[in-house]
Amino acid sequence: MKRAHHICTLTLLLAILSSTGLAQEQLPYIDDGLLDSTNIETLGLKPSPAVKTFTIFSPKDESMHYANGVVMTAFKGVLFCMWQCSLKDEDAPETSVVMSKSTDEGHTWSQPIVIAGANDNSYCTSGGWITTTDTLTAFINTWPNHLEPTGGFTRYMVTTDGCKWSNPEPVRMYNGQPMNGIIEQDPYPTASGRIIGAAHFQPGLHISPIYTHIPTGRYGWKRACFTFHDRNKQSRELEPSIYQRRDGTLVMLFRDQSSTFRKMASISKDNGNTWSEPAVTNIPDARVKQSAGNLPDGSAYLVGNPTGAKRRWPLVALFSCDGIHFDHALLLRAGGKNLQPQRYPGKAKTLGYNYPKSMVHNNKLYIAYATNKEDVECTVVDLEELKQILPTN
C-alpha cells in the first residue's frame, strides 16, 4: 500500500487546513483537441518561423558519448550551459559535469570543459544555476557510489568572471546542515525575493518543495509543508518545475512515476510555505523531466513531451494566459526525419528530446535538452515573432 508522508513545520494543523482549501484550486489543464495524439511525429502541430535550433555539443568517436541534464543561464552577457557526461552509459562511475559558453546568443558554443569531476567515492550530475549581478552559482548534484537506496546531496561552485571557479562546498539548509538531497535544476525567483525550488531528499529520492531568501541559493533553504506519495525508495512525484499565476499562486508540476502519463500538479497560495497534495492533471506527459516558467508578459509556459506515452518526441511548448487553461501549443522539434539518428549506443540512452530546461533572456525563450542523450542542443523561440503567430495574452 502506498503511504503519504507529511513534511511540515510546527504549524501542522494550519498547514493541513490550508492544503485542504488548496485542493479545491483549479488544476492546470488543456483542451482535448489541442494535441493530436495519433500524429506521433508532430502531435498535429506545424513548424514555426519563430523557432530555431542550435547545436551546443555533438559527440565524436573520441569524445564522451552520453549527455543529459542540460541547463542554461545568462551571466554578464554570456550564455552558460551545463550538462552531465560520461563515456557511454547513464550515471556511470565517471559521470562528470561539463560547461560550455556562447557569446553570440547561442549560435555557437565553446568546447566543453569539466567543472565538477567524479572521484573514487561519487559521481556528479548537473544541478542548475542561480545568477546575481556579480556571481554565478553552479549547483552540483553528488551521488555516492554505494549509497542504498540511491540518493545524494548538493554542492555549489561560484565564479565572478565565468572562468575561475571556487572549490565545491555543501549547499546548506537554514539550520546550517548540508542539504541531504538532490536539488532540481530550475529554482524559481519570486518578486518577494524568495527563491522557490525543490529537492529529492534521502533516504532515496523523496521530493519536497524548498525555499530560501538568500539570493545566491547557497544556504538558508527550508522544506515547505508538503504531502508526497511514498514508493519506498522514492516518491511518486519527481523532477518538478514551477511557474506562477498572475495572482501570485505558485504551481509545481511533477513527473508521475505511477505511469499515468499525465503531469501531476501542486499549488501554493502563500509564496511556497504550504502546498496542496499533488493531483493528476489532464496534461499528457512521457513520464519525463519537464520545464515550466513565465514569459515577460506574465503568461505561463510548459515545455516537454506531451505524448501520453514513453515516446520523447516531439518537443512541444504549451502556453496559458492565466496559468490554468493551456490553450496554445508550439512545435519545437518534430520526430521522424527531423530527429537525427542515435550514433552511439549506451545504457538508458533514450531516443528523443530528453529532459528540457528553459530560460527567458533578451526576449527569447531558450530551451536546452539532450537529443538521444548524446547531442546537446538548444531551441530558441523569438518572443516577438511568437506574438504574431501565437497569441499568449
Explain the meaning of each model-derived region.
Residues 1, 22-24:
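Non-catalytic N-terminal targeting/anchoring module and adjacent flexible stem/linker
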Residues 1-9:
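Bacterial N-terminal signal peptides that target proteins for export
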Residues 9-19:
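Bacterial N-terminal signal peptides
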Residues 24-65, 73-122, 130-239, 243-287, ...:
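Beta-rich carbohydrate-recognition and catalytic domains
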Residues 70, 125, 240, 290, ...:
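Structural signature of WD-repeat beta-propeller blades
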